[in-house]
Regions:
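N-terminal, membrane-interfacial amphipathic/helix-forming hydrophobic leader that caps
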Residues: 1-98, 264-315
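Membrane-helix interfacial "entry" motifs
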Residues: 10, 14, 18, 64-72, ...
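Residue-level signature of transmembrane alpha-helical entry/exit and packing/kink sites
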Residues: 14-18, 22, 68, 72-76, ...
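Hydrophobic/aromatic residues in alpha-helical transmembrane segments
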Residues: 32, 86, 127, 175, ...
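C-terminal TM-helix exit segments that contain a strictly Trp-centered aromatic cap at the helix terminus
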Residues: 33-40, 127-132, 249-255
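Juxtamembrane helix-loop-helix connectors linking adjacent transmembrane helices
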Residues: 61-68, 74-77, 99-166, 176-177, ...
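Hydrophobic alpha-helical transmembrane segments of multi-pass integral membrane proteins
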Residues: 79-90, 118-128, 191-195
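Transmembrane helix-loop-helix hairpins at the membrane interface
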Residues: 153-314
Length: 315
């Protein structure tokens, strides 16, 4: 028996309860969580009013164009703080599971694994960037504004790990537990949240700019990688750490035109080749899984083992 997937009880374990939880969290995110961004947009509109009849003035691109990138990043990350807080509360109320049980099925978080995931994935990503920079330095524009970068660093290091961990909590944690309880299959538990994770990111600006197919493949690969290590490790701490450093580097080290994280990162890539990036991501993911499998002596046979059905609710 494993802890993470098999800590689920029969308390409100049907699929529609999970759908309701996600719906409530999204509603909270788009109301309470959107307050900072709403205030920023109203302030911007007061300073630079646009006629209500100008429909184009209310496009996302137009609205975001005048917003300070650090303020936008902070307001975006705040919405995930709200989502995570509401999710923890609702899951406990509906299913009786604590936030630590959603993470690994126990009452304690294995923080050492969080930092191992962060370190290993971080080294791979920095190494990949270094190779790209050395082979084509002219493709990168170095930008360093000390004051703005200090604020970016503070916002990134305090809020991006929450944003990233929130996504892991929902997909590799909560939804994975739900799928496992419905299907009893670890393979479906790997695939379904990975597909949903990719679809969630389909509205990102990268998809419009670089193509649906290749970007969905990138997102699906990330979801699959983080899902696989979570199944093998019986918890999502490694994925939380890896996802956190992935987005931290995307915020602080390198950005590009069309990125969902529009920040004053140290470097801006002039040209992005999504097909090449997908190939590099495949290699990085294989190496990442291999290193972790060596460290933790994982047994891949567990992927075909059935998940026990939800246990009865104790009165």
């Amino acid at each position: 028996m494993t802890n993470h997937l098999e800590c689920v009880t029969a308390q409100k374990s049907q699929w529609y309860w999970y759908l309701l939880v996600i719906f409530i969290c999204f509603m909270a995110t788009n109301t309470v969580g959107a307050i900072p961004l709403f205030i920023i947009l109203i302030t911007q509109w007061i300073q630079n009013p646009k006629p209500l009849t100008d429909i184009n003035s209310f496009s996302q691109e137009s609205m975001m164009s005048g917003i300070d990138s650090n303020l936008y990043l902070a307001s975006m990350a705040f919405s995930f703080v709200v989502f995570l807080a509401v999710a923890i509360w609702i899951i406990k109320m509906f299913h009786g599971r604590s936030w630590t049980e959603v993470i690994n099925g126990t009452k304690r978080v294995r923080w050492s694994r969080f930092f191992v995931g962060l370190a290993v994935w971080g080294v791979l990503q920095v190494g990949s960037f270094a190779i790209n920079y050395m082979t084509d330095p002219n493709n990168f524009e170095f930008r360093f504004e000390p004051v703005r970068f200090i604020f970016l660093t503070i916002i990134t290091l305090t809020m991006i790990p929450i944003q990233s961990s929130c996504e892991e909590f929902v997909f590799r944690g909560y939804l994975a537990q739900g799928v496992a309880s419905w299907t009893g299959s670890r393979l479906w538990t790997l695939l379904i949240p990975s597909v949903l994770f990719a679809l969630l990111h389909s509205a990102n600006p990268e998809v419009t700019k670089y193509g649906f197919g290749v970007m969905m493949a990138n997102y699906f690969l990330i979801g699959l990688t983080f899902g696989l290590i979570s199944l093998l490790d019986d918890g999502i701490e490694l994925a939380m750490g890896a996802h956190s450093i992935n987005n931290i580097l995307g915020s602080m080290l390198m950005t590009y035109e069309g990125s969902a994280l529009r920040t004053d990162a140290l470097f801006k890539a002039k040209i992005i080749n999504p097909g090449e990036d997908l190939f590099i991501a495949v290699i990085s993911s294989i190496v990442f899984i291999g290193i972790l499998a060596f460290i933790y002596k994982w047994k891949f046979g567990i992927l075909t083992r059935r998940v026990s059905p939800p246990s009865p609710v104790l009165s």
